């Protein structure tokens, strides 16, 4: 998460400066053949437009003499060359060889909005080692869902670096066909940003002059990139064909009558994914026998506050393309469409037969259509999972200004003797002085429910957001969710309520470390949620959290907070087999503090602790996440999340643990892997996963994956639990043909 925040903040904040420069810069086509070797002082780079940089942190607006970037193109590729001088080259942070890894290395990030949509961008980052990291930005950086900043989005592109006695340099080569350029007035227009960091100095620089210090937090995104024109560039249609072959050997246990029976499952499968640019503005994706065997397993979570649902991020590649287009904010951390409802049923994977997705623009409207069919699964004595069709339709149209839109979404989940349909309207309205109004309304219909009632089957969300990070800023929201509202393809944090939310904050930046201890401080005076029943007869939940956070000039940050909370339980909440909060009214309070180290350190030890009353007793919550970097080839990431709950009236207490250790290794830029071990004390299971990837080049991979879960206490039930529930070893080969 830290890597996403750092790269996003760097790209986003700098883009305000681009907005101040309205002149379109002409990028000329190269007449030279650029050899991708990481050197930018070669003859082939002469004559290209050179962008200069200005410092963003810690000293605002100072000119930077250490960094330059050049951009050009030929018939097939966009090229970027960056010269990043370093007076102390031995201090370059260079410890990442993993694709999409992040360990606090120095980086160069190139963001491009291919058609000056002023909403969407692709970000290509490279580290001194040559390791690469890419992501997509949607909705102009306005967080409408989990896909606004999407680090799981992978592109086919190349990058090379060189480290010298003067610093380091990088060259990019990005296929034109992957960028979906569209000619307007016989020109190709785009927006760009470039960021360079020197993390040992906690320093970052950007192209072009910088904004005033009082800037919005995340609004200055693609809408304020530097406008450029690619003179003489001709768009190329996108065509990618990715067949795969897969073999797996596995076994699982299922309960049959009076015992657990083992079932072996050995498979050989094949499938194909196709991406085709129907027009310059419309892209069609087709997937047959869709597979996600190489996707890393989810982190284990214990839901102590199990009055809310747990949101897990989408990691599967098929759902990453234009994922932000399908974001529909249905309220606090809630979505009308949640892609993890497809192919995952009650935590169990169900095969996807295939599907299609169409995304792009029709006239000035963003359009998206998605439809997938899952296979039915026979579970023996546990019943079966029916084959289902999942479909989504999405429209969005710009109104008022570049940062505002109105939209429509419809979802439909269909299986034998059942359907669930949802429709909704949403919008984002950018108002003066960094103020945003974000409304949505949606309604659902499903078979075998009570008669449709507009209020009971609907949900309304209204959000007013002052999007700043210094000075005074605030958020205010209202949300209503009817008793029968149930989006079969969505995610709801909470259901059946009225909710009122408000926050009031004050932030302050300091540029001179000789005059202040903290580079940034923030006071949150109020951060409060109030939940009522749908008829306003009872308060369900109320809380207010006030906190202070400060970030030092070296990147270390500290937070302290206090919280009051009220809960009305109409039915007991069970945390473990021995811990249960009974029906009743509860008021509790707790305090906490946390420390997060600067990401430049080889050894990092973030820690968070809180303690206070908790229903009928107390809870001590502790979280530590140590990371140790052993150079470029090996690192260890660990986490320990613990809750010590004591209920004096029941004379019970228990420690609840979730422990995870992840070993990441990389022999070079092509061969890498990881080993993960996780323990969950509530389920009393230990989960293991090992993953090896040989990346010949982007789109050409071999994966070896092993997953298994172990039952630690097999005597929890009668008959005894099996040693494990599922075990599988998979080898997968895929190759992408593209032009």
Which residues are covered by each model-predicted region?
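Structural preference for beta-rich elements and adjacent junctions enriched in aromatics
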Residues: 20-396
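Short glycine/serine/proline-enriched coil/turn segments at secondary-structure junctions
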Residues: 61, 164, 182, 415-418, ...
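Catalytic-domain carbohydrate-binding cleft regions of carbohydrate-active enzymes
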Residues: 172, 189-191, 262-264, 269, ...
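Membrane-spanning beta-strand positions in outer-membrane beta-barrel proteins
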Residues: 79, 169, 181, 240, ...
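Short, glycine-/Ser/Thr-/acidic-enriched flexible segments
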Residues: 85-86, 115, 197-199, 246-250, ...
């Amino acid at each position: 998460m830290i890597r996403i925040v750092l790269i996003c903040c760097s790209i986003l904040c700098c883009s305000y400066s681009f907005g101040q420069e309205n002149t379109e810069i002409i990028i000329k086509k190269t007449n030279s053949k650029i050899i991708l070797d990481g050197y930018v002082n070669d003859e082939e780079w002469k004559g290209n437009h050179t962008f200069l940089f200005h410092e963003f942190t810690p000293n605002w607006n100072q000119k930077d003499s250490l960094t330059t970037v050049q951009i050009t193109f030929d018939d097939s590729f966009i090229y970027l060359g960056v010269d990043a001088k370093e007076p102390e080259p031995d201090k370059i942070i260079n410890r990442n060889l993993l694709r999409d890894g992040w360990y606090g290395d120095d980086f160069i990030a190139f963001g491009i909005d291919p058609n000056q949509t002023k909403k969407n961008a692709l970000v290509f980052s490279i580290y001194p080692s040559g390791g690469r990291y890419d992501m997509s930005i949607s909705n102009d950086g306005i967080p409408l869902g989990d896909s606004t900043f999407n680090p799981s989005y992978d592109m086919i592109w190349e990058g090379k670096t060189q480290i010298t006695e003067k610093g380091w340099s990088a060259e990019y080569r990005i296929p034109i066909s992957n960028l979906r350029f569209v000619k307007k007035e016989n020109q190709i227009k785009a927006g760009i940003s470039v960021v360079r960091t020197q993390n040992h100095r906690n320093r970052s620089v950007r192209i072009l002059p910088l904004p005033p210090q009082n800037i919005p937090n995340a609004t200055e995104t693609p809408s304020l990139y530097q406008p450029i024109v690619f003179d003489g560039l001709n768009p190329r249609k996108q065509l990618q064909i990715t067949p795969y072959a897969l073999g797996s050997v596995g076994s699982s246990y299922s309960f049959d009558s009076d015992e657990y029976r083992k079932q072996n499952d050995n498979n050989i499968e094949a499938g194909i994914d196709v991406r085709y640019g129907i027009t310059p503005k419309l892209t069609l994706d087709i997937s047959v026998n869709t597979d996600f065997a190489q996707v890393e397993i989810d982190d284990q979570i214990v839901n102590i506050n199990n009055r809310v649902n747990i949101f897990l991020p989408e990691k599967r590649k098929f759902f990453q393309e234009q994922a932000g287009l399908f974001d529909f904010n249905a309220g606090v951390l809630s979505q009308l469409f949640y892609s993890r409802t497809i192919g995952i049923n009650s935590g169990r994977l169900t095969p996807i037969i295939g599907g299609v997705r169409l995304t792009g623009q029709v006239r000035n409207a963003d359009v998206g259509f998605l439809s997938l069919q899952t296979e039915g699964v026979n579970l023996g004595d546990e019943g079966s999972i029916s084959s289902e069709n999942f479909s989504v339709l999405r429209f969005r149209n710009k109104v008022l200004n570049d940062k505002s839109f109105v939209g429509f979404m419809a979802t439909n989940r269909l299986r034998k003797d059942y359907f669930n349909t949802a429709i909704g309207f949403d919008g984002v309205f950018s108002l003066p002085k960094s103020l945003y109004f974000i409304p949505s309304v949606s309604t659902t219909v499903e078979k075998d429910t009570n008669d449709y009632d507009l209020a009971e089957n609907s949900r309304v969300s209204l959000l007013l957001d002052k999007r700043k990070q210094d000075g005074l800023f605030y958020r205010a929201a209202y949300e209503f969710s009817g008793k029968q509202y149930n989006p079969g393809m969505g995610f709801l944090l909470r259901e059946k309520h009225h909710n009122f939310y408000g926050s009031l904050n004050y932030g302050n930046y300091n540029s001179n470390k000789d005059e202040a201890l903290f580079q940034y401080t923030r006071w949150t005076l109020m951060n409060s949620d109030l939940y009522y029943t749908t008829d306003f007869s009872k308060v369900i939940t109320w809380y207010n959290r006030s906190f202070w956070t400060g970030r030092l000039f070296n990147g270390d940050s500290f937070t302290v907070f206090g919280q009051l909370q009220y809960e009305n339980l109409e039915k007991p909440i069970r945390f473990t087999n021995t811990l249960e909060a009974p029906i009743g009214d509860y008021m509790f309070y707790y305090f906490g503090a946390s420390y997060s180290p600067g990401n430049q350190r080889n050894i990092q030890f973030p820690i968070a602790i809180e303690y206070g009353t908790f229903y009928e007793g107390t809870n001590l919550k502790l979280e530590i996440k140590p990371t140790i970097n052993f150079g470029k080839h090996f690192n260890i990431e660990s986490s320990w999340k613990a809750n010590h709950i004591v209920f004096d009236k029941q004379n019970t207490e228990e420690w609840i643990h979730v422990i995870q250790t992840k070993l990441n290794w990389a022999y070079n830029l092509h061969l890498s892997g990881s080993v993960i071990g996780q323990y969950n004390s509530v389920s009393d299971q230990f989960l293991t996963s090992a993953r090896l990837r040989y990346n010949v080049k982007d789109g050409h991979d071999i994966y070896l994956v092993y997953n298994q879960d172990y039952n630690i206490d097999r005597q929890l039930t009668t008959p005894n639990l099996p040693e494990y529930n599922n075990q599988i070893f998979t080898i997968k080969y895929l190759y992408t043909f593209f032009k």
